[in-house]
C-alpha cells in the first residue's frame, strides 16, 4: 500500500486506473507526486473500495461528485482560486448525503495538511482532502464521483468545525462565501434547491466580516446573494442569522429572506445586536433592508417586527423608512396586514423618539385595520407625536385608525402621556385624536371617543373642548375637565355640545353660554328664568330693586348686596322647587332688569369707561356679601 503508480492496482481486485488504500507514509508519497492530490492517488485513480474511473462509491453518488471531508479541512480551503473556504468544498461541490453532479463531500482526517500539498495543482482543484482534479477522497470514489447523501447539482454539504477561520482565508477568492464555507450556488443541509444555502456553523459572524471583500457575498449567517437558510426557502431568500450577525449585516444586500417560506425580496428576523448593523446598512431597524419581510408569510414590500434596540437604528435609516418598530413605508407587521399597513412591535420605551424621525402617515396597527389606519401607541409616544408635526398625539397621523376595525379617517384611544403631545400638535384635539378622527366604539366620521388621563391640559392648548372632543362632538368627560370649563359648556363640553344632566363644575356660571336640548345645559336654565321674569312676583321684586338702587346710589356696595340678598330670599321662598343655581340666575336677571329700568329713565352724561373694572369689583364684592 502507498506505492501504487498511475494505472496500477492494489490489493482487493481493483480495476485498471484504480488504486487501493494507502498505508502509513502515503503522505510523503503524495508530496512526490506533483500532479497528484494527497493520499497518493494519481489522476484518474481510485482509493479503497475497488471502484474504477467514472465509478461510484457507497450511496449511489453521481459523476463529478466527491465524498465527505473530516475535521481540519478548513485550513485547506485557502489553496487554489475558485475553491471554497470552510469544509474544503469547491465551487458547485457538495457535502455529505447523496450529492449530485459537480458536488463534493467532506474530506477525511488530516486533509488540511494535504491541501497545502495540492497548492501547486492547476486551478479548479479541491483544497481539503488533497484530491487532485476530478479525483475522489475516502471511499474509493473515482473522478467525477460523489460522496454520500444524494444531493442535487450545484449543492454543497455542511462544513465541519473550524470553518469560520477557513472562511476568512477564502476571502481573496472571487465569488466565495464567508461564514459556513459555502461557495456561490452551493447548498447546506436539508435538501435545499439550487442557488440556496444552509445555515452556518459557530463563529460564522467573524467569518462574514472577513468575507466582505468578495463580490456578491453575504454578511450574516454566511449566506451569499440568492442563497437560502433552513426550511426549504425559495430562491432569493435567506435564513436567520446567528449571534453576532449584526456586524455582518452591514455587508448584507436587500432582497433576502428569513424563516417560514417567505416570498422573494423578503427577510426574516435578525438576531441580537442587529440594531447597530441596521444603521450601517441603510436599512430599517432590526437589520431589515427596504422591501424585506418579517415572520409570518407577509407579502412583498412588507416587514416584521424588529428586535431590541431598533429605535436607535431607525434614526440612521434611509429616507422613506419607518423608525418605530423598524417598519418601512408600505410595510407590514405580524398578522397578515394588507399593503400600506403596519403592525405592533418594537413600540417599547424609546421607540417613540425614533418614530418621530421617519414616521409616515397611512400605516396601520394591530387587528386587520384598513389602509391609512394605525393602531395604538405604546408608552412614550407622546414625545414622538410632539416631534411629528403632521401626526396627532399618541403617534397617530392624520386619517389613521386605532383598534377595533374603525372606518378610514377615524382613530383609537391614545396611550398614557398623550396629553402633553396634544398640546404640541396644534391641529389635533386632546387625547391624541386628530380632527375628523374617531375613538373606540365604532363612532362615525367626525366624531371622537373618550380621552385618556391628562387630556384636560391638552384641551386648553387645542381648539376643541376638554376631554378631546372637537366642535359639534360630544362624549363622556374624563378627569380634569374642570380646568377647561371656562371656555366650554358645563361638563367640559365645547360650544353647542351637551353633557348628561348638565353635569360638571361651573355649569351654573356657564349657563349663559348657549341653549341645549332635552333640558340639559345652560340654555334650558336661562329659558326658564326668562319665563319667570314675566310673572307678577318678579315684576314686584324688580320695582323694589329699582327703588333701593336709586335711593342709595349706584356705587354703594352695601346697597347692591342688600338688593341681591333680598331678591334671592324672595325667589327661593316663592319657588321652592328651584335649585340654588336657578335661584341665583333668577335674582341676577331681575337686578339686570332693574338696572335697565334706571338707565332708560336717566339722562346719561359722559361715561368713564376706565372705571368699568372698578365697578365690576364692586359687583363681585356685593355678590360675596349677599351670600
From Swiss-Prot:
Keywords: Repeat, Secreted, Silk protein. Coiled coil: none annotated. This is Spidroin-2. One of its GO terms (cellular component) is extracellular region. It is found in: Secreted, Extracellular space. Residues 1-23, 37-70, 82-108, 126-160, 175-201, 216-242, 255-271, 284-307, 320-349, 362-378, 392-415, 429-452 have a biased composition (Gly residues). Residues 24-36, 71-81, 109-125, 161-174, 202-215, 243-254, 272-283, 308-319, 350-361, 379-391, 416-428, 453-464, 471-488, 495-508 have a biased composition (Low complexity). Spiders' major ampullate silk possesses unique characteristics of strength and elasticity. Fibroin consists of pseudocrystalline regions of antiparallel beta-sheet interspersed with elastic amorphous segments. The keyword Kinase does not apply. It comes from the Eukaryota.
